[in-house]
Amino acid sequence: MVEWLDVFTRTEYKNILIESLEFCQKNKGLEIFAWCIMTNHVHLIFRSIEGQKPELLLGDFKRFTSNAIIQAIRQNYRESRKEWLLEQFEKAGSKSSNVNKFQFWRHDNKPIELWSNKVIDEKINYIHNNPVEEGLVFHPEDYMYSSARDYSGEKGLLDVFVIK
């Protein structure tokens, strides 16, 4: 998220991410191992199972969600920060030569390869504890917008391949 803006405080914007991840799972070969939507960023551990490079899959996801969320912000009559948010996205876009008007996602968040089981476990624990560290919940599995529920034996919002 550019400038670490707190966009995902509204359920409708988080739902756009959830629906987009579901679409990528069903149609683009996205296999999710862990995820978490925070107010100003998203964590995702995934792989591409249909031969598409992870960075291209992530790029498609980011392009679609940036357009969909900006459109949702524009149309949301309850969005008290509408003009300010759009101004921030436009300002960020003006700094980048490959952005037409608005920049929603940061350009420096690229997929990285997780090279060992130890590192994977560390990253999953970090992701799941993010809402606890932010004071949003007391236990990771209590946070709805995360795969921590799946790892605690409950069913979360998305299909997740739990790593044991």
Show which residues each predicted segment covers.
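Short catalytic/metal-binding and nucleic-acid-binding patches
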Residues: 1-164
